[in-house]
Each structure stands twice: as C-alpha cells, then as structure tokens.
C-alpha cells in the first residue's frame, strides 16, 4: 500500500497543469497520503528538488496558467544510470509512486521508472498540441484553442480594415488539431496542416482566384514547422499584389488562465490518477474518451493509440469557402 506520492510536470507547459497538480494533491491528502512536489520536471528530480506539499500549497492555483512546480527539458533521462539515480532519490524520501503530467516523452520516462525500478507511475496528458495518445483531449488544448481563435478574430479586424492577407502560424508540431479547429472557428479562408503535403503554388493560385472574384482580405492558418511563414508572406505578396503579413502566435498559446473545460478535465484526471495508484496500478496513462475517464498501458498507448487525422474537417472548410 502506497503512503507517499510525488507529482511533477514535464515538457512544455500547458494551461490546466496547476489544476491537475491540485487534483492530485488534495485527493491524495483526502486519502491519507503524503504528497511531494518535484520542481522542474525530471531535471529537478535528478537534482533532488523535492518538497512536501499540503492543501494550502495548491490554494488558488486552479485559476493560474503554467505550472507552479516548473518544468524543464531533460534528455539525459534516457540514460539508465540517470533513471536509477532518480529512483534512488524518490526512495530516499519514502516515495512509492509518481504522477507525471506532460506529453508522450514524459510518459515514456514514467513507464521506465515503473518497469526498471518499481516506482508506480501514472501519466496525465498535459500539452496544448492535443497529440498525446489514448485521449480525445489533452490538458491545455481547449485554452490554447480559445487563445488562437481570439488572435484570429483580432487579425480579421485589422486585415479587413487594410485589405490585407494575414498568415497566422499556430503551434501543434506534427498534429494540426489546434490549427484546423481554430481556423474553422475563426472562419479562416485557407488551412495548411502538417498532415497534408504543402503545395505552395496551389495555395497562391487559390488566393489569386479569390481576389479575382472580389475577395478583399483573407486569413491563412498554418501549423508550425511547415515553412517559413515570413518568406511565404513575401512570395504571396509578390504574386497577388496584396499586402501580406505573417503572425507567429508562438508561446502566447501556452499561457493564460485555463478555461473552465481545462480546469475541470485536469481536476478529474488528477483525482483519477490517485485512484489508480491506490489500486496498485503503475505504468499507465490517463485519458478521456467519449466523455469517460480511461487508462491505458503507456507503451500500448504510444504504439497503438496515435490520434487519427480528421481530414473531413479540412474538406468541410473547403465547402464553407
């Protein structure tokens, strides 16, 4: 029976992480467990940055963006000797189990701690990219989506005023959920998704046809890492003779107070993680599917439960414009 658990956040921060930490801490305390916070992710674990938490440690954090525990990239965790030291540090505090909030890279580290060292670990999906396996939604995605839509709405105002073409680059890496849904909600004329090969010439020809038909402004939503959006803006302006500007939303999408959906989702997942640990389960990741909380073996989720690309949403956007 576990008596002490720890919680850490790893990888890129996401709105709602604090709500998840709060869910873990207060539900664990309710069950009579001692709870410790690991500061600065796996890096902090390796450097023994661990502090005991109480219910007041998480007072008012549900409204705050980011993660008060801090986060850090720590590729050295792939080294078995580094993981062994981390497990030793956890045991030196009497910690039996660990909740890891982050993406699939964070999940893999948690699974290895469970398999190699018997530390019961549960992963919670904390990333704005909505690309974690085994879940319909990740903690932070909905807030980031609202941030992106708000930015698109503001760009629409100025683009229409100046008869300008605006390119907005949205985060997501290799998952375009943010881009596609923000574009649909914001009424963007064009979507460039990472899952579909980018044809620059086709895009420019579409814009030329729209302008010939009387279009006075347009917004292009594009997922990050596909192309240099500032260079793309120059090429479009040269071809269509319309002022074209690129806006990179960047890390502003990670910040801000989490929306109600993310606060509730994160709280539910935090409580569910503690329930799993009390059942003696480790090496699992938590998700929400069809509105129900679920858990999957981490490796099975990573290998077999990748999110499928919803091409029908792109098709729908073409029909709407």
Swiss-Prot record:
One of its GO terms (biological process) is canonical glycolysis. Its cofactor is Mg(2+). It catalyses: beta-D-fructose 6-phosphate + ATP = beta-D-fructose 1,6-bisphosphate + ADP + H(+). Keywords: Allosteric enzyme, ATP-binding, Cytoplasm, Glycolysis, Kinase, Magnesium, Metal-binding, Nucleotide-binding, Transferase. It comes from Mannheimia succiniciproducens (strain KCTC 0769BP / MBEL55E). The gene is pfkA. Mg(2+) binds at residue 104. One of its GO terms (molecular function) is ATP binding. Homotetramer. Its EC number is 2.7.1.11. ADP binds at residues 22-26, 55-60, 156, 187-189, 215-217. InterPro entries: ATP_PFK, ATP_PFK_prok-type, PFKA_ATP_prok, Phosphofructokinase_CS, Phosphofructokinase_dom, PKF_sf. Coiled coil: none annotated. The active site is at residue 129. NCBIfam families: PFKA_ATP, PRK03202.1. It holds the Pfam family PFK. Allosterically activated by ADP and other diphosphonucleosides, and allosterically inhibited by phosphoenolpyruvate. It is found in: Cytoplasm. Pathway: Carbohydrate degradation; glycolysis; D-glyceraldehyde 3-phosphate and glycerone phosphate from D-glucose: step 3/4. The keyword Disulfide bond does not apply. This is ATP-dependent 6-phosphofructokinase. Substrate binds at residues 127-129, 164, 171-173, 224, 245, 251-254.
């Amino acid at each position: 029976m576990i008596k002490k658990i720890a919680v850490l956040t790893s990888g890129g921060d996401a709105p709602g992480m604090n709500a998840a930490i709060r869910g873990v801490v207060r539900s664990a305390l309710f069950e009579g467990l001692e709870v410790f916070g690991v500061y600065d992710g796996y890096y902090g674990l390796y450097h023994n940055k661990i502090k005991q938490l109480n219910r007041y440690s998480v007072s008012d954090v549900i409204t705050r963006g980011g993660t008060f525990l801090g986060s850090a990239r720590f590729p050295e965790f792939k080294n078995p000797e580094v993981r062994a030291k981390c497990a030793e540090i956890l045991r030196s505090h009497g910690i039996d189990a660990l909740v890891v909030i982050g993406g699939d890279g964070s999940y893999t580290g948690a699974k290895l701690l469970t398999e190699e060292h018997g530390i019961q670990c549960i992963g919670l999906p904390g990333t704005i990219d909505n690309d974690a396996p085994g879940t319909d939604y990740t903690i932070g995605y909905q807030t980031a989506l609202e941030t992106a839509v708000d930015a698109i709405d503001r760009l629409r105002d100025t683009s229409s005023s100046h008869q300008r073409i605006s390119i907005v680059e949205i985060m997501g890496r290799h998952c375009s959920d943010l881009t596609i849904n923000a574009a649909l909600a914001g009424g963007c004329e064009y979507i460039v998704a990472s899952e579909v090969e980018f044809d620059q010439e086709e895009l420019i020809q579409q814009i030329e046809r729209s302008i010939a038909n009387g279009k006075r402004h347009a917004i292009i939503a594009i997922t990050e890492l596909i192309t240099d959006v500032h260079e793309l803006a120059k090429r479009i302006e040269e071809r269509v003779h319309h002022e074209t500007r690129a806006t990179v939303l960047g890390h502003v999408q990670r910040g801000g107070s989490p929306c109600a959906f993310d606060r509730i989702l994160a709280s539910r997942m935090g409580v569910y993680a503690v329930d799993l640990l009390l059942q003696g389960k480790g090496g699992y990741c938590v998700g929400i599917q069809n509105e129900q909380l679920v858990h999957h073996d981490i490796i099975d989720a990573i290998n077999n439960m990748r999110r499928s690309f919803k091409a029908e949403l792109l098709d729908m956007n073409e029909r709407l414009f």
